[in-house]
Amino acid sequence: MRGAQVRPIGVIRSRIISREQAPKQGSEGAPDAWLEVKPSLAAALDGLAVGDEIIVLTWFPRARRDTLKVYPRSDRRRPLTGVFATRSPDRPNPVGLHPVTVRRIVRNRLRIGPIEAIDGTPVVDIKPQLPTPNS
């Protein structure tokens, strides 16, 4: 298999600055944040509107890529579980998936939330949430 190449399209600007500050999920008290899209890609935002539900895909540069099993939600009372059966950021390809709402649009910047990503997290893609799978 050939190596895949993914280039960031933007970055998250958040008041969360460490893994310890980040909630496990966006729905668990995460703040809103700015998603700054590279100016050269701003035209790709055409069609997005305030109130849209989108999925933001991020790359977790601080994640451990050699982790194969974790205690779900860091709870050692639970059994060790393969990372593909969890939402752990530590995994062979540390891609984050964040369902968020567009709160504001200013040129190449989207105010989105709630999102548990750390300030400086690279964004690799944005996709609309569709009413039904595969629509």
Region roles according to the model:
Residues 1-99, 103-135:
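Glycine-rich, low-complexity intrinsically disordered segments
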